[in-house]
From Swiss-Prot:
GO terms for molecular function: trans-aconitate 2-methyltransferase activity. Catalyzes the S-adenosylmethionine monomethyl esterification of trans-aconitate. CDD domains: AdoMet_MTases. It comes from Rhodopseudomonas palustris (strain BisB5). Coiled coil: none annotated. Gene3D superfamilies: S-adenosyl-L-methionine-dependent methyltransferases (1.10.150.290), Vaccinia Virus protein VP39 (3.40.50.150). HAMAP family: Tran_acon_Me_trans. GO terms for cellular component: cytoplasm. This is Trans-aconitate 2-methyltransferase. InterPro entries: Methyltransf_25, SAM-dependent_MTases_sf, Trans-aconitate_MeTrfase, Trans_acon_MeTrfase_C.
Amino acid sequence: MADWSAEQYLKFEDERTRPARELLAQVPVLAPRKVADIGCGPGNSTELLVERWPQAAVIGVDTSADMLRQARERLPQQKFIEANVAHWAPPPDTDVLFANAVFQWVPDHLKHLKRLVSGLETGGALAVQMPDNLDEPSHILMREVAFEEPWRHQLSKAAESRDMLPKPGVYYDALRPLCSRLEIWHTVYNHVLDDAAAIVEWVKGTGLRPFIDPLDLHERKAYLAAYTARVAAAYPPQADGKVLLRFPRIFFVAIK
């Protein structure tokens, strides 16, 4: 997959940052020595961490060069590194691991979550939020269009870019033996957007990328036209003309 686009992602910065704020509010660590923002993106979540813990050494970690470029422009005093969390280990004395909307992209992510919790010192925290929206029309329709001609050959594997998330009980059973406390919850957002085209713009920043990146300009235009038409049918306008993008997310905070 091509690099992520920070510009596209930030078109809905307020809406994308809200889950990070709500996750952070449930982290009880008062004075961490070091904090790592895993999947920091363009630095919007990192900024929250710096504001919450100005005395801590906060680093951002991401695989995207474009996201990291934007993060460094936003927070020039902070350290950002390019790394894949599947092969990355936190620096010693890291007391908070914060991961907003990243682990859904990591294969076998439960294994890595267990590794990260196990490496925390007593009182440290792993805080995670992941979109749980593969069964929403926005994502069902991506796959539906991709499995049709003329895109089937190129996009047959795109639907495999993200696995369905396990049930909350699976996370609980895997992580609870490794920590002193585990909080886990779901939140369903209903984001108010202008129209179906705005929903498409939203998912172009993240979930739609594996479907459109393999296509050339002409193919991409045709795919997006077919997808947008189905999104418009699945998300009818409200009385004022706006549409509601239903967006479930799972959260958990593990305290060592």
